[in-house]
């Protein structure tokens, strides 16, 4: 197993776990209390609480990254494409979040970087396959 594959498994797995945990935390406590989030962050957004953002985070970022992790672990066809798409979803999620609530946490920037790293790794895996 090479460094690109190991790095991909680690970063995609970390992102999946974080997004699933964060999304479920928002769904189970839409006030944001489990994550120490204030609903005041949502002022000016279309959301009154974290329920809908939690569902989106869980389904689109968390489960998509979980699918990418399964593809990576099982070495399924189209793994690189699934991984790249999951990274793109994460990037879109973070950009939309920044547009809606603005810059609040360093994690927003960190996860934008994570999305870029995931895209880079997916491209590297694709190159190694050729």
Regions of interest found by a model, annotated:
Residues 2-130:
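Topology signature of small-to-medium multi-pass alpha-helical membrane proteins
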């Amino acid at each position: 197993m090479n460094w690109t594959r190991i790095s991909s498994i680690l970063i995609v797995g970390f992102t999946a776990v974080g997004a699933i945990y964060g999304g479920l935390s928002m769904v189970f406590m839409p006030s944001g209390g489990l994550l120490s989030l204030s609903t005041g962050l949502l002022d000016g957004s279309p959301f009154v609480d974290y329920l809908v953002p939690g569902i989106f985070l869980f389904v689109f970022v968390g489960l998509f990254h979980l699918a990418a992790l399964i593809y990576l672990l099982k070495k399924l066809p189209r793994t690189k494409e699934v991984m790249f798409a999951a990274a793109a979803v994460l990037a879109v999620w973070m950009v939309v979040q920044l547009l809606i609530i603005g810059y609040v946490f360093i994690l927003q920037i960190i996860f934008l970087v994570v999305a870029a790293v995931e895209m880079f790794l997916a491209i590297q895996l694709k190159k190694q396959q050729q």
